[in-house]
Regions:
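An active-site-proximal structural segment forming one wall of the substrate-binding cleft
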Residues: 1-7
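Bulky hydrophobic/aromatic packing residues
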Residues: 11-14, 141
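Acidic-residue sensor for enzyme active/binding pockets
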Residues: 5, 83, 134
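Active-site-adjacent pocket scaffolds in enzyme catalytic domains
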Residues: 10, 17-129
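C-terminal domain-boundary segment and adjacent tail
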Residues: 106-169
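Short glycine-/small-residue-rich flexible loop motifs, especially phosphate/cofactor-binding loops
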Residues: 2, 42, 164
């Protein structure tokens, strides 16, 4: 955190866990693949002065589909933190994380725009995350199992143009 603050010249106010690794339920419940870790992790973020988190995905694979899809405040013993859930949409009737990575690279912009526009009337943000390495259309390749390779490298070619088009829309 200090290294990034040193580079930007400003405070880092938000956090997003790598690979949506918090999982679990906001109160430390039993759903998700990392149950019981959420409460203590949020306590650390509050203690460290973070104002918001965007690590709790409201879908079954990496979080809990019952979590809110709009921003909400989570009260902890040491204070509170705002949770900014990532953009979730539906594709072929299945709720999917549209926020970043393979989905943001692969889902057509018209589908992403529909998901974003559905949030606009309520004034809710469409939270997406962009990884800087994704702007390299030909990054160094590492040996990975097929599904990991597909998720990691799929859709990199043309991604920058796709994102620019999405932002212009």
């Amino acid at each position: 955190r200090q290294a990034v603050e040193g580079c930007t010249g400003g405070p880092i106010l938000g956090y997003r866990a790598p690979r949506w690794s918090l999982g679990g339920a906001p109160g430390g419940g039993r759903r998700g693949r990392a149950s019981g870790v959420v409460g203590p992790a949020l306590d650390v973020l509050v203690r460290e002065g973070f104002r918001y988190d965007s690590s709790l995905a409201p879908i079954v694979h990496i979080g809990d589909p019952d979590w809110p899809r709009d921003p909400y405040r989570i009260d902890r013993p040491g204070g509170s933190i705002v949770e900014l859930p990532p953009l979730v949409g539906r594709r072929f009737g299945v709720p999917l994380l549209f926020a970043g990575g393979w989905a943001l690279r692969r889902v057509p912009n018209r589908v992403l725009l529909r998901a974003i526009e559905a949030r606009n009337p309520a004034g809710a943000p469409a939270v997406i995350d962009v990884h800087t390495w994704e702007f390299d259309p030909d990054p160094p390749r590492v040996r990975l199992p097929f599904m990991y390779r597909l998720a990691h490298y799929g859709g990199l070619r043309g991604y920058r143009a796709k994102l620019e088009e999405l932002l212009r829309s």
